[in-house]
Amino acid sequence: MAWSSSFLFIVLPLAAAVAVQPQDTELTFLLPAGRQECFYQTTLYNGSMEIEYQVIGGAGLDVDFSVTTPSGILLIMERRRSDGVHTVEPTEAGDYMICFDNSFSTISEKLVFFELIFDNQQGDEEPDSWADVVEPDELLDIKLEDIKESIESVKSRLERSIQMQTVLRAFEARDRNLQDSNLERVNFWSAINVGVLVTVAFLQVYMLKSLFDDKRKIRT
């Protein structure tokens, strides 16, 4: 079985050198027939990783999906699925392997979309240097901590909205590909039906005409 691998953290050149918070990632790729594609994503111990995938193109709209820990433990294994959502709570830091397998298909390639969403507590804690600049008596009954919480809440909701819009775009792409495939099938079989109808019509005219042809010889 042919397979290949990719590293998602190559977009972050310093990710391999220092422990940084993983960034949310989304990717759409073409999975050839009879192939397996694996991606490696670095995760932190105290965070969570949400994986969502959809097959948006290709016959059957299905792939095999698996997630393996850095130590080689198989966490998730799904066969012939068109989509899925999984939340992984990393029990060990390192590179998790995410694989999509199309080896069961010998002809059809698949267009696959997947997204990784991270929730790491340590990455959200930023130094509040701005809070040390303003004295408490200068806050005028407005707590800077409340303002910060409101901003963080708005930021979190906006990020979630972006993620949902990305997922909806993937659904729309899959539905559009499915409609295009159905349109081709409808046009193909409609053309065959028209051809059959025209052939039957000519045969009926020919047979009716032959019934009225008097081929008997007339004696004089």
UniProtKB/Swiss-Prot annotation:
Any one GO biological process: protein transport
Coiled coil regions in record: 138-164
Regions of this protein lying in the Cytoplasmic compartment: 209-220
Gene Ontology CC: endoplasmic reticulum membrane; endoplasmic reticulum-Golgi intermediate compartment membrane; Golgi apparatus; plasma membrane
Domain of life according to the entry: Eukaryota
Residue span(s) of domain GOLD: 36-118
Keyword Acetylation: no
Signal peptide start-end: 1-19
Family of the protein in this entry: Belongs to the EMP24/GP25L family.
Protein name: Transmembrane emp24 domain-containing protein 1
Organism: Xenopus tropicalis
